[in-house]
């Protein structure tokens, strides 16, 4: 059985950022996975996370949009902010509550940062990610503005999310990248080919989002069957019924292995991510304190090399049917930017 354990600390990247070895993805408290949770319940969960040793919180200006940052601003008042490492993101330009485009131009980078600081009610963001890459703007241009924000004391560390290996390398040459956020789990392993190696070559921390396959590795096909109509996952290829029928086989195999191991499927899947290296920090999200407690206990699940190998063999690319996102969504696979020489500021 997975035991209660203390959440260890880890160095994320090479610039000095220290975080809890498991973070908390905050998106579902406000958006995308059904109706927003009551504010008092959400704040109680955030405070419980801190008291349990999970202090690395992940949000974005597009969660809500904006309401998730406002929630965290309220939850972290009265000195609570000093106990956490707070990451937020920019990049999705929102018009009337809907994503209009991805932007990485200097004017927008600065405006987005200042708006996030105001909503979060803080003077400096610990880790500021470009949420998605603007493929019209050379990454060097975006990074130069982020570097200025570091120099001005508005952000401490810079991160990228869903960026290609070449984009990461070019960005890192302008200013050190502290962390790259990428989907990484037993059912999303395509980052292992190029993204993980470039991060390790450059000393960049790896933040694994959706380490439980957006909940599928915790609840299996019944999750897909019971999604609310306004749940973002209903639109994702992997949650369509024809793909769920295939993907449930992976869940069943993980469940059987977890039963033998004396832990839950979610804990086994999360433990696999934790075992990928000391430079990896998964950020599972949840809206329930009990699930948070269960996720923390995954840190106590020790996997042998043979068990890791068995999980690797279960989670081959052919084990999962359906793309991670709709074709229109920006990911690291379509995130290369024009050469710097092409840029003409307007």
Swiss-Prot record:
Per the record, the similarity remark reads:
Belongs to the aldo/keto reductase family. Aldo/keto reductase 13 subfamily.
Q: Which residues form the active site?
A: 63 (proton donor)
Q: Spell out the coiled coil positions from the record.
A: none
Q: Which organism is it from?
A: Arabidopsis thaliana
Where NADP(+) binds, per the record, is at 210-220
Name of protein: Probable aldo-keto reductase 2
Keyword line: NADP, Oxidoreductase
Name the enzyme group at the top EC level: oxidoreductase
Residue positions annotated to bind substrate are 131
According to its UniProt record, the EC number is: 1.1.1.-
Q: What molecular function does GO assign, one term? A: oxidoreductase activity
């Amino acid at each position: 059985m997975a035991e209660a354990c203390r959440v260890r600390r880890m160095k994320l990247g090479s610039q000095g950022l220290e975080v809890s070895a498991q973070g908390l993805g905050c998106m579902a408290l406000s958006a995308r996975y059904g109706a927003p949770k009551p504010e008092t319940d959400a704040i109680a969960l955030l405070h419980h996370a801190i008291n349990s040793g999970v202090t690395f919180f992940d949000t974005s200006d597009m969660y809500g949009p904006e309401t998730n940052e406002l929630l965290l601003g309220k939850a972290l008042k009265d000195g609570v902010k000093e106990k956490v490492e707070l990451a937020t993101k920019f990049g999705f330009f929102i018009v009337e509550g809907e994503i209009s485009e991805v932007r990485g131009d200097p004017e927008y980078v600065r405006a987005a940062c200042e708006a996030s600081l105001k909503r979060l009610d803080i003077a400096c963001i610990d880790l500021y990610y470009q949420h998605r890459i603007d493929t019209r703007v050379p990454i060097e241009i975006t990074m130069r503005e982020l570097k200025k924000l570091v120099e001005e004391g508005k952000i401490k560390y810079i991160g990228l999310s869903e960026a290609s290996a070449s984009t990461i390398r070019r960005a890192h040459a302008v200013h050190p990248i502290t962390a790259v956020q990428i989907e990484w789990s037993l059912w999303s392993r395509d980052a292992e080919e190029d993204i993980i190696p470039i991060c390790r070559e450059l000393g960049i921390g790896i933040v694994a989002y959706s380490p439980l396959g957006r909940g599928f590795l915790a609840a299996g096909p019944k999750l897909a069957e019971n999604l609310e109509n306004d749940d973002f996952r209903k639109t994702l290829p992997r949650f369509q019924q024809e793909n769920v029928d295939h993907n449930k086989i992976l869940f069943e195999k993980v469940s059987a292995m977890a039963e033998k191991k004396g832990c839950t499927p979610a804990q086994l899947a999360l433990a696999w991510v934790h075992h990928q290296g000391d430079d990896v920090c998964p950020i599972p999200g949840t809206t329930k304190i009990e699930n948070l407690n269960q996720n923390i206990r995954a840190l106590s699940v020790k996997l042998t090399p043979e068990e890791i190998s068995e999980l690797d063999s279960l989670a081959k690319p052919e084990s999962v049917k359906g793309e991670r996102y709709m074709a229109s969504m920006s990911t690291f696979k379509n995130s290369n930017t024009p050469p710097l020489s092409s840029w003409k500021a307007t």
